[in-house]
Amino acid sequence: MDFIKIVNEEFKSGKEHPKFNSGDTITVEYRIKEGNKERIQKYRGVVIRISGHGDKKRFTVRKISDGIGVERIFPIESPFIENITVEKYGKVRRAKLYYLRGLTGKKARIKERRVALSSKD
């Protein structure tokens, strides 16, 4: 077996995350280490890009904080990600939503896609 594959298997987080696409509004609970303390920060925003494949897959989340657009890139297999929850499913026709960077207010809104959730009965 290839050495790179062995190392990638060792660092895999093994956590199951829900499926999401570009345009979905998600909340990422991310573990942050500050000095000797550790806390969980929630980062909520719109997924504007999913790139990579396999273990190197990553996604970019954009949110507006105090009128300023902030983007953060998360690796999907990061051991620091505690949880990902999908708040809203967006209805978009593009895979990369870079055009949202130039829009503000109501123009930056994304239509909501209705999804039938299966019950666990």
Swiss-Prot record:
Q: Which residues cross the membrane?
A: none
Gene Ontology BP annotations: translation
- Entry annotated with the keyword Transmembrane helix: no
User: Which gene specifies this protein's sequence?
Assistant: rplS
The scientific name of the source species is Porphyromonas gingivalis (strain ATCC BAA-308 / W83)
Protein family according to the UniProt entry = Belongs to the bacterial ribosomal protein bL19 family.
| An example Gene Ontology molecular-function term | structural constituent of ribosome
Q: Which terms are listed as keywords in the entry? A: Ribonucleoprotein, Ribosomal protein
Specify the protein name.
Large ribosomal subunit protein bL19
Entries under PROSITE patterns matching the protein: RIBOSOMAL_L19
GO cellular component, as recorded:
cytosolic large ribosomal subunit
Which InterPro entries does the UniProt record give? Ribosomal_bL19 (IPR001857), Ribosomal_bL19_CS (IPR018257), Ribosomal_bL19_sf (IPR038657), Translation_prot_SH3-like_sf (IPR008991)
Purpose: This protein is located at the 30S-50S ribosomal subunit interface and may play a role in the structure and function of the aminoacyl-tRNA binding site.
Record flagged with keyword Ribonucleoprotein:
yes
